[in-house]
């Protein structure tokens, strides 16, 4: 069985307040700060900034 890695699941939530989100993983050791990335929001059909949120 493989050892547990140090990657943590995160949710990227749209700043356009549409409720749309992506899920991904990130390495906490290499990127301790909150992630912000520009991705496509299909609800508003534009590229918007997505901010990191914890998965409940």
Swiss-Prot record:
A GO term for molecular function: structural constituent of ribosome
Entries under PROSITE patterns matching the protein: RIBOSOMAL_L33
Superkingdom, taxonomy of origin: Bacteria
Any single GO BP term: translation
InterPro entries documented for this protein: Ribosomal_bL33, Ribosomal_bL33_CS, Ribosomal_bL33_sf, Ribosomal_zn-bd
Record's GO cellular component terms: cytosolic large ribosomal subunit
Key words, A-Z: Ribonucleoprotein, Ribosomal protein
Pfam families reported in the protein's UniProt record: Ribosomal_L33
NCBIfam families from the UniProt entry: PRK00595.1 (NF001860), rpmG_bact (TIGR01023)
Similarity field: Belongs to the bacterial ribosomal protein bL33 family.
Stored PANTHER family: 54S RIBOSOMAL PROTEIN L39, MITOCHONDRIAL, LARGE RIBOSOMAL SUBUNIT PROTEIN BL33M
Protein name as catalogued: Large ribosomal subunit protein bL33
Species name: Glaesserella parasuis serovar 5 (strain SH0165)
